[in-house]
Design a protein with these regions (language model features):
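Domain-level detector for secreted/extracellular nuclease and nuclease-toxin modules, and
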Residues: 2-268
Length: 268
């Protein structure tokens, strides 16, 4: 009698298990497959470039990531994602440039730029960091700064910063990388800590939206500008050749190759 009860109990348990398995299969068969395109899916770290050699000290901040060049005392590159929501920030602009506490070795101070003839040129702009007090303050670390021609800093470079915020509002977000270019033409240093003056600057911007996909490369000589932004346009491939960096490598290869070889004639 005891064995019969055990068999009945086992049979009931097995039947319940079979019912659960069948129900699970039926429910999952009704789930639609994911069809989101690459442009619609967020890709973490899309803006972080890959250095082919001579990678600097990586420093991650609230609003950006940079690779610091201890030899030239400037960043190699600064990268960040700017979203539509972040462009709505109301945080007041900081005015205090400070040494970066996380830089290893010699730290650049604001006085290195005093009476140098060059601006303290932001790479990741303060205007992109208004969404966070901490992000705003960190944008004034000297590791995010390069000696920059005053007219370039306040005019064409600034115009591209404003245009980038416009694209972020229009397309939801943009991925940005910028930094100095040293070509060995200029052998100029400023300040007690010998900050090297860049020959030029680059900026690459990725718009990866279902409505618009493009990668823009910009090349600026470190001199007075006041020219249309279209005149600074080049391909991202050209910037990669100049810098030895691989941009937007998280994109599928075919898409990356197509976007990065194109030189746009007009801005989005």
């Amino acid at each position: 009698m005891g064995n019969q009860k055990k068999r009945q109990s086992w049979t009931k348990w097995l039947a319940a298990l079979v019912i659960c398995i069948v129900a699970f299969i039926i429910n999952n068969s009704n789930i639609e497959p994911e069809t989101a395109t690459m442009a619609e899916e967020p890709i973490a770290g899309m803006e972080i470039p890959v250095m082919k050699n001579n990678q600097g000290q990586i420093i991650r901040r609230t609003g950006y990531t940079l690779s610091y060049d201890a030899k030239n005392k400037t960043p190699q590159w600064v990268a960040w994602e700017l979203t539509k929501e972040e462009t709505r920030g109301k945080e007041e602009r900081s005015t205090e440039f400070t040494p970066d506490p996380d830089v290893k070795g010699t730290k650049v101070v604001t006085y290195d730029y005093s009476h140098s003839g060059y601006d303290r040129g932001h790479m990741a702009p303060a205007g992109d960091m208004k969404w966070s007090k901490k992000a705003m303050q960190e944008s004034f670390y000297m590791s995010n700064i390069c000696p920059q021609d005053h007219n370039l800093n306040t005019m064409d470079w600034n115009e591209l910063e404003m245009k980038s915020r416009e694209w972020a509002r229009r397309y939801g977000k943009v991925h940005i990388v910028c930094g100095p270019i040293y070509k060995g033409i200029r052998n100029e240093y400023i300040g007690e800590h010998r900050v090297k003056v860049p020959d030029a600057f680059f900026k690459v911007i990725l718009i990866n939206d279902s409505r618009k996909q493009c990668a823009l490369g910009f090349y600026f000589e470190n001199e007075a500008g006041e020219r249309p932004l279209e005149e600074y346009l080049t391909s991202v491939d050209d910037i990669e050749n100049l810098t030895g960096m691989d941009f937007f490598s998280a994109l599928p290869d075919n898409l990356e190759n197509r976007l990065e070889k194109e030189i746009l004639k007009d801005l989005p």
